[in-house]
Every structure is written in C-alpha cells, then in structure tokens.
C-alpha cells in the first residue's frame, strides 16, 4: 500500500502556463529571439528549463545561461503567481494528509521558487518537504530530485512510494529510483508520452486521481 506521495508541481498541483509562457517570451526578447509559434511553448512546462531552451533553440551553454537568467527575472517578479491550483487538488491533499500519509513536492523548478508557489497558495502545511532543483543548475533531473528525497529521508520504503506527474520526466525519474508512478492527463503530457515510459497508472483528471486513492484505500472519506 502506498503511504508516501511525491507530487510534481507544474502541471500536476498547479497550472503555471501563463507565467511560464510569459517568462519564456520575456527571456527570448532579451536574447534577441522572436518566437512566432507561441502555442508550442507549452513544451516548456515540466522539463528542466535549461533543457527546453537547448532543445527548441539549439542554444550554446552561454546562451542558455543568459536565457535562464532572464526567464527567472520575470518569473520572480510576476510569473510565479500567474498560476492556479487545479480544481480538486486542495481536497485531495487534505484527504491524503488527514489519512496519515506522507506528502512531498518533487519538482524540476528551483526549490526556492517552488516554496514560494506553495506558500502563495497556502499549501505548505500539507507537505513534509519541498524538493526542487538548485539555482546553480544542478539537481535538475527528476531522478536526481527523487534520489535526494530518498537520501535525506532514509526511513522511506520504496515499495510504499508513488510519484505523481504529468510529463515523461516524472515517470522516468520514478522508474530509475524503483518506485511506482501515476501519470496524469490534465497537465501538459499526453497518454502516448506517459505510456511509452511505462507509467504504473494513468488517470485523466483530478477526480479520477481522487477515486484511485479511494479504491486503493489510501484515503479515508
């Protein structure tokens, strides 16, 4: 039975689309790149930001550093809070917590920013720890973030842990650390993406995620 829940942040707990897209556009303007296919910038939601800039614009290391600097500049000023908690998430966290489960945030977003988002939406009390990447560009992969949680909480039992996320990076991170995973379809991944990396379970929305927990007797109604 699962007793420890690792939640991705962007696209799983909150919908950060407006803030992330605006942060990317701000950064691109600063480095002299014009993006005409703005709808395709959804791909920046979830993966490490450095990776997204490299894959889409074939940036050099120096260009990535500049782009990330400006991305974070806008994010800190406005982008973090151009964001919304998905409907049903608060109830889900309340039920998981009151049923005695342990809950963590495991995100590729820098820890300092993730904590600001969680605090802004008054969700801090539901999480035992909030773990993200480092501002210096280290610990950006989801497998590294999950491994860090396991290392700093040695008492955790992998067989009782499950990672919940909307992108393949969440599932890959779980697989590489030997824990189960739930891929959610209400974020920014698709069923094909999550199936190809062997998500343990897939749910279509927050309501189905809630009922999954009920059926598994993981929460008390």
Report residues per predicted region:
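Conserved Lys-Pro-Asp/Glu-containing loop-to-beta segment of HAD-superfamily phosphomonoesterases
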Residues: 4, 142-171
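Acidic, Mg2+-coordinating phosphoryl-transfer loop and its flanking beta/alpha structural elements
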Residues: 163-201
């Amino acid at each position: 039975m699962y007793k420890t829940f690792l939640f991705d942040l962007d696209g799983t707990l909150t919908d950060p689309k407006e803030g992330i897209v605006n942060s990317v556009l701000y950064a691109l303007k600063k480095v002299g790149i014009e993006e005409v296919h703005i709808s395709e910038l959804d791909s920046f939601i979830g993966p490490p930001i450095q990776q997204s800039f490299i894959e889409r614009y074939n940036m050099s290391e120096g260009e990535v550093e500049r782009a990330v600097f400006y991305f974070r500049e806008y994010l800190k000023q406005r982008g973090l809070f151009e964001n919304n908690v998905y409907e049903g998430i608060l109830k889900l966290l309340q039920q998981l917590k009151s049923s005695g489960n342990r809950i963590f945030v495991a995100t590729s977003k820098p820890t300092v920013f993730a904590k600001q988002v969680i605090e802004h939406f008054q969700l801090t009390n539901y999480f035992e720890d909030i773990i993200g990447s480092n501002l210096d560009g280290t610990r950006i992969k989801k497998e590294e973030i999950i491994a860090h949680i396991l290392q700093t909480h040695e008492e955790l039992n992998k067989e009782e842990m499950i990672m919940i996320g909307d992108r393949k990076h969440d599932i890959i991170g779980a697989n590489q650390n030997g824990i189960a995973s739930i891929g959610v379809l209400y974020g920014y991944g698709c069923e094909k993406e999550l199936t190809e990396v062997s998500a343990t379970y897939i749910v279509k929305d927050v309501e189905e995620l809630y009922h999954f927990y009920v059926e598994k007797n993981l929460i008390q109604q």
